[in-house]
Regions:
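C-terminal "post-core" interaction segments
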Residues: 1-175
Length: 175
């Protein structure tokens, strides 16, 4: 998401039930504003795991503020019903901040971070750990994000460079 904007902007936040019940404000949550640029050594990974093990997962995500880039202002993101998880976070951040046009179909609405365990017969139970909320207050779990420009498609017409959503995205970029 940091590549979409030159500025440091709040992206969204996760909030656990415990933090929500306490009435904590998003502004008071710990901030994650930079991802490591180098792969840490195994000892650093172990140290980080021990530091954050059992910690409340509530955190604010903030873009890194990487400065101006050539592509800023001319970005189109293509979505469909399989766009989920971090893909929905990127789309929501871009849409809320006017950083890109979203073209295609509504996203999946599957965004809650969770952890799971096996229950046998090849099944897993996944339990939510926290809710994800965009900085503007929107939650997508169970209902996806509508694109700026809805483009109908079918599996037969979606393959290849002339798929309707890609054609629409190209038109937007060329105009």
């Amino acid at each position: 998401m940091s590549h979409l904007t030159p500025a440091k902007l709040p992206i969204g936040y996760t909030v656990s039930r415990r933090m929500a019940d306490r009435g904590n404000k998003k502004e008071d949550l710990p901030r994650l504003d930079r991802l490591p640029t180098e792969l840490p050594n195994p000892l650093a990974i172990l140290t980080m795991a021990m530091k954050y093990a059992g910690r409340d997962p509530s955190v604010v995500l903030v873009s890194e503020g990487l400065g101006p880039k050539n592509w800023h202002g001319r970005v189109v993101i293509v979505t469909n019903e399989h766009t989920a998880s971090a893909g929905e976070m990127v789309c929501a951040f871009a849409k809320e901040n006017g950083l890109a046009k979203i073209v295609g179909a509504e996203t999946a609405g599957r965004l809650i971070p969770g952890s799971g365990f096996k229950v046998g017969e090849g099944y897993r139970v996944i339990l939510p750990k926290a809710a994800y909320v965009t900085w503007g207050g929107r939650r997508f779990e169970g209902r996806g994000m509508a694109p700026d420009i809805q483009v109908e498609w079918s599996p037969e017409t979606f393959a290849g460079p002339e798929a309707p959503p890609l054609r629409q995205a190209k038109q937007l970029l060329m105009s």
